[in-house]
Every structure is written in C-alpha cells, then in structure tokens.
C-alpha cells in the first residue's frame, strides 16, 4: 500500500509540474511585447531544467554545471527560503564535492544522511567541538613566506577589524607574527601551530631572553636580523606590538580551538579525488567569534582551487557559502572571477547586497556581483535594491481600455518588494529576467524523504588528548649567533 501511495505521489507531482510549465509558457506568450518598450520575463526553461546538475535556484529547476561555474549570488532576508529553496535542493541534486558554510547546523542535519548514502565522505569542521571536528591547522598550509605573511595579515585584520586609528600597530603586529610563525616552521611539525605562536608571545612579554635564544639557534641571518630590529624598539612600543599580536590570537586561549587547530587532517585533494562534503559549523551566536578561522580556511581553499587545473577525471568542487557577509575574504573578488577555469563554482548567500559593499567597498562588491552569472532576489528587498531592480528590469508599453499607449515598468519597486513568498527574480548574464516560482524542498516527495534520513555518526578519527608545547630546552641554547659576511 505504501508503495502504491508513493508512486501516486510521484505521478501527481510530475503531472503538476507539467501543467505549471505549460501555464507559464502560455502566459508568457500572451504577455509578449513587440513595442518600443518591450521588457518581458523569460520562460524559466531557457536556463533552468530539472535534468541539469548545477545550482538549484527554484527548489526544482537547476542551472547547468557550466553556468554554475560562473557563480551565483542569492539575496534575501531571514525566513524567505534561501535554505529551503536553494541550499537543500542543491545538496540533494548536484554532483561533485562541496564546501558548505553551515552556521546553523541545519544543512548537516538534513542532508548528511542522504549524501552518505550517495557515497560521499562526510567531514565537519567545528571549532567548538573537537570530538566530532576534523583538524585544521592554518600554519601547516603556509608553505612560502608570502603564505605566512598573508596568514599573519588575516589574523590581525580579521580579529581586530582593520580599524586601528594608527595603522602602525596593525602593520607591526603583522610583521611580528610573520617572524614568529617563520621561526616555528623550523621546529618539529607538532609544534607548528598558532597555539605555540601565542606561547612565544607570552614568553616575549615575560621572559624575552628565552625567545632570543630560540632565534639565535634556529633563525637564518635574514630572519635573525629582522627579529633583532624588532626587539630594538622602545620597551613601551614593543609591549604595544606584542599586546596587539596577543589580541589577534586571543581565540587560541580557547582549549577547543587550540585542539582543533593543533594539527591537520583535511586533505584538499580529497575533494578532487572522491565525492566529499565538508560542513563548516559554528553556532549562529558565536559566528563572529569563529569567523577569523573560517575566513582563513576559505582563503587557503581558494589558493588551492586557483593554484592548479583539475584533470578530466577529477571532481568538480562547489562552495555554498551561507551568511557570506559574516566572513572576511580578501581573495573573494579574484576567486569569483577565476574559479570557472578550475571547474568550480561559488554560491554566495547574503541578506542584502549592501553587506558586500560594507565588507569589500563599492567597486569590489560590484565586481563580485558582475562575476556571478546568476543573481537571485527574494521578496522583501530593501528600497534601494528594489529601485535598482526596477531600472534593470526595464519598461514595456501596452494599450489601455481606451486604446491609449501606456508605458510602465515591468515591475515597480513596490511590486518587487512585496512579491509573493513563493516568487523570486532571477537575472542571469545577458538573458532576460525570470520571475521564478519557488518550491521548497519539504514540498518535494523525494527531497522531503532525503531530509529525514538519519545523520551518520561523526567522530574525529585522530583524538589529541594534549597539546604539544614547545619544550623548554629549545630556549636554552647558547645565544651568540654570528652573522656571516656582514660588516
């Protein structure tokens, strides 16, 4: 009996979809305008299909993978259906590997069971929960001096907001962190993490001679000279720089964060070699607290994506970044302009476009939007966005009941702002706009079933019971380092 009911539900859903498509096609045909002003909506079928495997933008219809490589920008306030219409259906229907920013944890709960059934390797990065989290160590991925400098810069700028009245402190803090991370890279791998950078800062404040000895023994001449020039600062200035550095690394006083970032178990190449999904989770309330590490992760993943071209047999990689405005991603403008060449696509979800303007400035925010092939606007847009959309959609003319020619906007800003909850505007590349009908996942027989599959048991395979702190003996070496060939 259950099987018969299930089959009937599927048939009804398919029949309903066909009727909806026919109705929209006929309606669009009758509403076409062949006048001087002839703005009109396109039929969704010109870009979207149930049989594609790219980003799902309506809950049922998807872009092609090729179009998805050109990115998508989803804009809508809380509760309008960004997750239920776009994120869940995309996870249920797309192919390839995923990096998913999942602040609420809901995406993992309702998709991991199905993805595991499909053969996906499920990973979680949760800085507050070491027992289930994969390990991620930003220092281990900083291979070159420029990588180290970028990491130090992100730690300072993201943690402190880059809003210091005097940029001297942030600049010098970045330089000192770069020097300390570089000296740590000369030590055993278990000591190469930001927890131990923080320990070095503590020693500089209380026992600077021990750090002098470390540099004397392990630094090359260039690094040793840079360190000496730093400690030559006036004591008050040096204390201020150290304090700025410690504020940047304040997170690493948290034992959970220190454990998760002490080593690294995430192999970026896995995402190319087999179907893999990583959910980056932190509670919504703590999102700002953890955003430094999440931002650094995405920056380092962008470097991986843009650093090589995938082989034919390797997997596509898609990044679904919910609450993108909570992150500081300096490379994002470059990434959205170039990931298509690397068989990858980025979906950004924000509440309002002005959030991107606030983070990246007007020029870069416009660049990000321009490099997103699909731009999706849910109901409830701000007046500024709605007015801009009214101009973008254009105008059309018609004759009123008295035969007079009337010109009006395809949609006024009020009509855009007050669209029905089950409608959204899609503007894709050079194509005419689409007024899409939305179908949340829970109204789809298949997707609703997928969401109820149990979450697989998550457990970190490498349990670190303690943190490896730099041993005291390395600070006790004889400290008269001679500089070769320097007059």
Label each PLM-derived region with a short phrase.
Residues 1-29:
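Long, basic/Gly/Ser/Thr-rich N-terminal segments
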């Amino acid at each position: 009996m259950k099987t018969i009911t299930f089959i009937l539900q599927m048939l009804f859903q398919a029949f309903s979809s066909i009727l909806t498509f026919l109705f929209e096609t006929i309606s669009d045909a009758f509403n076409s305008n062949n006048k001087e002003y002839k703005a009109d909506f396109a039929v969704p079928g010109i870009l979207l299909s149930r049989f594609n495997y790219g980003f799902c933008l309506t809950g049922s219809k998807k872009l092609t993978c090729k179009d998805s490589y050109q990115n998508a920008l989803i804009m809508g306030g809380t509760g309008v259906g960004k997750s239920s219409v776009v994120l869940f259906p995309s996870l249920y229907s797309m192919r390839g590997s995923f990096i998913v920013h999942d602040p609420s944890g809901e995406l993992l709960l309702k998709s991991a069971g199905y993805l595991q059934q499909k053969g996906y390797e499920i990973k979680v990065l949760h800085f507050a929960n070491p027992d289930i989290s994969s390990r991620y160590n930003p220092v281990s991925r900083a291979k070159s001096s420029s990588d180290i400098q970028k990491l130090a810069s992100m730690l300072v700028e993201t943690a402190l907001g880059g809003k210091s009245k005097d940029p001297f402190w942030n600049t010098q803090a970045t330089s000192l962190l770069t020097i300390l991370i570089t000296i740590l890279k000369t030590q055993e791998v278990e000591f190469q993490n930001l927890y131990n950078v923080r320990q070095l800062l503590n020693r500089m404040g209380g026992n600077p001679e021990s750090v002098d000895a470390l540099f004397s023994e392990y630094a090359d001449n260039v690094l040793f000279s840079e360190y000496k020039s730093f400690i030559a600062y006036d004591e008050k200035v040096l204390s201020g720089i150290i304090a700025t550095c410690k504020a940047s690394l304040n997170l690493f006083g948290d034992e959970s964060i220190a454990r998760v970032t002490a080593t690294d178990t995430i192999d970026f190449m896995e995402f190319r070699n087999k179907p893999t999904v990583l959910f980056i989770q932190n509670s919504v309330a703590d999102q700002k607290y953890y955003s430094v590490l999440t931002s650094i992760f995405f920056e380092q993943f962008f470097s991986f994506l843009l650093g090589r071209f995938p082989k034919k047999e390797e997997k596509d990689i898609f990044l679904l970044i919910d609450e993108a405005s909570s992150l500081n991603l300096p490379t994002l403008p470059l990434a959205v302009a170039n990931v298509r060449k690397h068989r990858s696509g980025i979906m950004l979800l924000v509440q309002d476009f002005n959030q991107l303007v606030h983070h990246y400035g007007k020029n870069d925010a416009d660049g990000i939007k321009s490099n997103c092939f699909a731009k999706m606007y849910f109901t409830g847009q701000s007046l500024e966005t709605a007015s801009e959309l009214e101009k973008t959609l254009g105008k059309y003319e018609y004759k009123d009941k008295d035969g007079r020619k009337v010109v009006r906007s395809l949609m006024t800003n009020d009509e855009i702002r007050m669209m029905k909850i089950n409608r959204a505007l899609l503007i894709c590349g050079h194509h005419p706009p689409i007024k899409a009908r939305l179908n949340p996942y829970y109204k789809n027989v298949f997707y609703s079933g997928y969401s109820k599959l149990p979450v697989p048991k998550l457990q970190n395979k490498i349990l670190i019971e303690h943190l490896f702190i730099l041993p005291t003996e390395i600070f006790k070496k004889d400290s008269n380092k001679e500089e070769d060939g320097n007059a």
